[in-house]
Amino acid sequence: MDGESIKPSSQPLIQTGDDEKNQRTITVNPAHMGKAFKVMNELRSKQLLCDVMIVAEDVEIEAHRVVLAACSPYFCAMFTGDMSESKAKKIEIKDVDGQTLSKLIDYIYTAEIEVTEENVQVLLPAASLLQLMDVRQNCCDFLQSQLHPTNCLGIRAFADVHTCTDLLQQANAYAEQHFPEVMLGEEFLSLSLDQVCSLISSDKLTVSSEEKVFEAVISWINYEKETRLEHMAKLMEHVRLPLLPRDYLVQTVEEEALIKNNNTCKDFLIEAMKYHLLPLDQRLLIKNPRTKPRTPVSLPKVMIVVGGQAPKAIRSVECYDFEEDRWDQIAELPSRRCRAGVVFMAGHVYAVGGFNGSLRVRTVDVYDGVKDQWTSIASMQERRSTLGAAVLNDLLYAVGGFDGSTGLASVEAYSYKTNEWFFVAPMNTRRSSVGVGVVEGKLYAVGGYDGASRQCLSTVEQYNPATNEWTYVADMSTRRSGAGVGVLSGQLYATGGHDGPLVRKSVEVYDPGTNTWKQVADMNMCRRNAGVCAVNGLLYVVGGDDGSCNLASVEYYNPVTDKWTLLPTNMSTGRSYAGVAVIHKPL
């Protein structure tokens, strides 16, 4: 074959008929880019083919221009433009610390970045500088996931400085939606005048009562009283005093020294008092910012069911999502607990006293829904199980109960501001297995068992915090111990319970205005020692027992139709003596 050359064939290897089109295949290897970047990172670690050194502080980082330019518009502009850095072998980056820059260049090569509480505040601005927008978004997402009443205002300020528009809106909405808890924190007290005005003037502010806004203003002024006193009138302009109850205006607002000493503020108070003197139809004709009800965005809620007997005391806590009709297990209690009092106060769920399977306890655990975590706080002064618990005027009241030997008439209150318990006036009757509720600023203790007469009780007492006195109100129509007590639309409901061996399904409701009880529709099932809560105009009764077994079912009452409906989904565990609270669904 000497002198001959190999010529390419003019015929394709695969031939098709004349009537068929030429065929071809394009393939994309999804792993190719990842492998390529992995090799480039290995070359960088060995300082092979590197053509630039990036310097920040005392940290020097070898890299490849083409890789940096491909992933960062900042570096692309630097290396392809007319700046001196386009040809420099060593480039200093200012306004970024060396460790952060190293992490970001690692990200360019590996697509991996760790965002933490410790580094997010330096990582986000550095990612913004290098125009690594995915990292910047990761930082924003992380901060959004960390929003909490104690930090949302700080995150809002950070987002504002760095023009993170979505995060700014999310943090601001969070502050509005959790205002009763936000106002208690150092961040709120450190806000500027304009920032406070902007927050409390929002129609979206979520408060159960305008009292919270008034209290927030007083707290902010008193935090630096000498320098802030002059701003009192400007702040009170945004407090919707006409929407406050008349008793609160007279007993609290009018008696506040900061109001008494300011003529403009006194004018706002007079305006509110005049508003209350008007008939309802005339009130509706008054159009000014202080008479306009706030219209907060409705936050989704979840129901927390804490501990209970199943059949022994348990640590389990379940969470019900109303929107999704789903039960989930959340963080367990630190120790077994049943027959406890459970309430929601200042953004947290409190589990108070109870029985741990062997002893009645004084201890109190607090649940943070954002962190999904329980912590312990100051213990009560007395051991109490089968107590009643309720919140009134920012105090948690522990009412009656059983200490292991006798029923209790004593009542103590807890202030989360001081982390201290103190006794208030005792009830007239010892009551264990007592139900409690708060209506129109009064605390009610309903039924129970007195231990002395060895009978279940039909009597009801009312506590007035202004006078520190308990007085009897109208009796229920029947004796009820272990009744589930809840409040809906300003009325007090007593559900189920028992009288000796007889477990009830009957329900009656108390109207404070007329001091009368009336029967409403029976529940679907007999229940005693059930948890009760009100959500979205419905009254939920959770678990309990029917005298023979613990119940996993939940039913709710609609006062419009006077009907009870069973939830389609049961708890995973039948439990009696569980506590129930409703919280905003954590983000």
From Swiss-Prot:
<feature type="repeat" description="Kelch 4">
    <location>
        <begin position="442"/>
        <end position="490"/>
    </location>
</feature>
<feature type="repeat" description="Kelch 1">
    <location>
        <begin position="302"/>
        <end position="347"/>
    </location>
</feature>
<comment type="function">
    <text>Substrate-specific adapter of a BCR (BTB-CUL3-RBX1) E3 ubiquitin ligase complex that acts as a regulator of ion transport in the distal nephron. The BCR(KLHL3) complex acts by mediating ubiquitination and degradation of WNK1 and WNK4, two activators of Na-Cl cotransporter SLC12A3/NCC in distal convoluted tubule cells of kidney, thereby regulating NaCl reabsorption. The BCR(KLHL3) complex also mediates ubiquitination and degradation of WNK3.</text>
</comment>
<feature type="modified residue" description="Phosphoserine">
    <location>
        <position position="10"/>
    </location>
</feature>
<dbReference type="InterPro" id="IPR017096">
    <property type="entry name" value="BTB-kelch_protein"/>
</dbReference>
<comment type="subunit">
    <text>Homodimer. Component of the BCR(KLHL3) E3 ubiquitin ligase complex, at least composed of CUL3 and KLHL3 and RBX1. Interacts with CLDN8.</text>
</comment>
<dbReference type="InterPro" id="IPR006652">
    <property type="entry name" value="Kelch_1"/>
</dbReference>
<dbReference type="GO" id="GO:0072156">
    <property type="term" value="P:distal tubule morphogenesis"/>
</dbReference>
<keyword id="KW-0963">Cytoplasm</keyword>
<feature type="repeat" description="Kelch 3">
    <location>
        <begin position="396"/>
        <end position="441"/>
    </location>
</feature>
<dbReference type="InterPro" id="IPR011705">
    <property type="entry name" value="BACK"/>
</dbReference>
<dbReference type="GO" id="GO:0050801">
    <property type="term" value="P:monoatomic ion homeostasis"/>
</dbReference>
<feature type="repeat" description="Kelch 2">
    <location>
        <begin position="348"/>
        <end position="394"/>
    </location>
</feature>
<dbReference type="InterPro" id="IPR015915">
    <property type="entry name" value="Kelch-typ_b-propeller"/>
</dbReference>
<dbReference type="Pfam" id="PF01344">
    <property type="entry name" value="Kelch_1"/>
</dbReference>
<comment type="pathway">
    <text>Protein modification; protein ubiquitination.</text>
</comment>
<feature type="region of interest" description="Disordered">
    <location>
        <begin position="1"/>
        <end position="22"/>
    </location>
</feature>
<feature type="modified residue" description="Phosphothreonine">
    <location>
        <position position="295"/>
    </location>
</feature>
<dbReference type="GO" id="GO:0005856">
    <property type="term" value="C:cytoskeleton"/>
</dbReference>
<dbReference type="GO" id="GO:0031463">
    <property type="term" value="C:Cul3-RING ubiquitin ligase complex"/>
</dbReference>
<feature type="modified residue" description="Phosphothreonine">
    <location>
        <position position="375"/>
    </location>
</feature>
<keyword id="KW-0206">Cytoskeleton</keyword>
<keyword id="KW-0597">Phosphoprotein</keyword>
<feature type="modified residue" description="Phosphoserine">
    <location>
        <position position="433"/>
    </location>
</feature>
<feature type="domain" description="BACK">
    <location>
        <begin position="152"/>
        <end position="254"/>
    </location>
</feature>
<keyword id="KW-0009">Actin-binding</keyword>
<dbReference type="GO" id="GO:0005737">
    <property type="term" value="C:cytoplasm"/>
</dbReference>
<dbReference type="GO" id="GO:0070936">
    <property type="term" value="P:protein K48-linked ubiquitination"/>
</dbReference>
<dbReference type="Pfam" id="PF07707">
    <property type="entry name" value="BACK"/>
</dbReference>
<dbReference type="GO" id="GO:0005829">
    <property type="term" value="C:cytosol"/>
</dbReference>
<comment type="similarity">
    <text>Belongs to the KLHL3 family.</text>
</comment>
<dbReference type="InterPro" id="IPR011333">
    <property type="entry name" value="SKP1/BTB/POZ_sf"/>
</dbReference>
<keyword id="KW-0880">Kelch repeat</keyword>
<keyword id="KW-0833">Ubl conjugation pathway</keyword>
<dbReference type="GO" id="GO:0043161">
    <property type="term" value="P:proteasome-mediated ubiquitin-dependent protein catabolic process"/>
</dbReference>
<dbReference type="InterPro" id="IPR030578">
    <property type="entry name" value="KLHL3_BACK"/>
</dbReference>
<feature type="modified residue" description="Phosphoserine">
    <location>
        <position position="376"/>
    </location>
</feature>
<dbReference type="GO" id="GO:0003779">
    <property type="term" value="F:actin binding"/>
</dbReference>
<dbReference type="GO" id="GO:0070294">
    <property type="term" value="P:renal sodium ion absorption"/>
</dbReference>
<dbReference type="GO" id="GO:0016567">
    <property type="term" value="P:protein ubiquitination"/>
</dbReference>
<dbReference type="GO" id="GO:1990756">
    <property type="term" value="F:ubiquitin-like ligase-substrate adaptor activity"/>
</dbReference>
<feature type="domain" description="BTB">
    <location>
        <begin position="50"/>
        <end position="117"/>
    </location>
</feature>
